[in-house]
Amino acid sequence: MTNSAPVTPRRDLADAPLLAAARGETPRHTPVWFMRQAGRSLPEYRKVREGIPMLQSCLTPDLVCEITAQPVRRHGVDAAILFSDIVLPLHAAGVGLDIVAGTGPVVAEPVRTAADVAALPSLAPEQVSKVGDAVGLLLDELGSTPLIGFAGAPFTLASYLVEGGPSRNHERTKALMHSEPATWHALLEKLADTTLTFLRTQLAAGVDAIQLFDSWAGALSLRDYREFVLPHSRRIFEGVAETPGAAGVPKIHFGVGTGELLGAMRSAGADVVGVDWRVPLDTAAQRLREAGPDQGAPVVQGNLDPAVLFAGWEAVEREVRRILAEGRAAGGHIFNLGHGVLPSTDPGVLTRVVELVHAESAR
């Protein structure tokens, strides 16, 4: 697969703590950013998003630039992550879906048969060119702060398409996987193409790192993950590595509840493995070493429980210090939450977390 977008020369940010940590080097301090840092916890976000639908917001370059930069200005985080949504490339390709407040992505016509899969539209680079435009604006806006691009992994996108929306048990998804494996793999091949096109658009525009979100992979057993999911996620990471101008761009892989899948997720081609709050980082690092003894020292990202941010500063400070200590067992550590920032989080607490991480880890 190729991408026709012209390639923007990548910024020289070799000393940026996020990129140094992702390479397993020793940065001047432990880098910190937060999943969903650009979102409803910020009053400035709520103001600029007022009255504008989510998917429209994601395709408005000036707005994407402003929202992406807001947490960098407010918190002093070590990376920005592109404001977008994991279902955006499906929407851009022509899949009928909407993001319903209080529910999440809702698909008009679920994909449940081989014919449905065959009819699923492909994504062309020009359909997400506005995302590339937003990245271009951000490179000027962010200065020396790295920009992380991202996309949803095929399994998580498939779950939304097959279930028709968010699901607790993913029963239709797993049923299709086991009853019609050929149809399942055809679906994930198409979704891997879509995801790779979306990521290559961001890479061509100049993002400094990428994260593949497999939000719902934790619903799977290790056996099922290896058979039905891993080959398609691996193809994405291989495609990213082969993208012109993207050599050396760090690749992060994250899912919720994936403590038993960490080694397999790394083996897909990730340089950094995101860990949720359920597994201590030193335990995660040990699991990664055991699963891939020939892959070098693992780099981990995480993993403060987002709910702890509501517990008062004494508890937050204690947990941050514990996580920093556990992270030292890995070959590198990027501080983050174990999932996204919750909408009612006090942004002042996030700023204090950034300050604490920087102060405690200064080298």
Swiss-Prot record:
Q: Which Pfam families match?
A: URO-D
Which terms in the Gene Ontology molecular function aspect does this entry carry?
Answer: uroporphyrinogen decarboxylase activity
Its annotated pathway?
A: Porphyrin-containing compound metabolism; protoporphyrin-IX biosynthesis; coproporphyrinogen-III from 5-aminolevulinate: step 4/4
Q: Which InterPro entries match?
A: UROD/MetE-like_sf, Uroporphyrinogen_deCO2ase_HemE, Uroporphyrinogen_deCOase
User: Its Enzyme Commission number?
Assistant: 4.1.1.37
Instruction: List positions binding substrate.
Output: R36, Q37, A38, G39, R40, D85, Y160, S215, H339
Q: How does it assemble?
A: Homodimer.
Instruction: Give the family this protein belongs to, as stated in its UniProt record.
Output: Belongs to the uroporphyrinogen decarboxylase family.
Q: Which protein is depicted?
A: Uroporphyrinogen decarboxylase
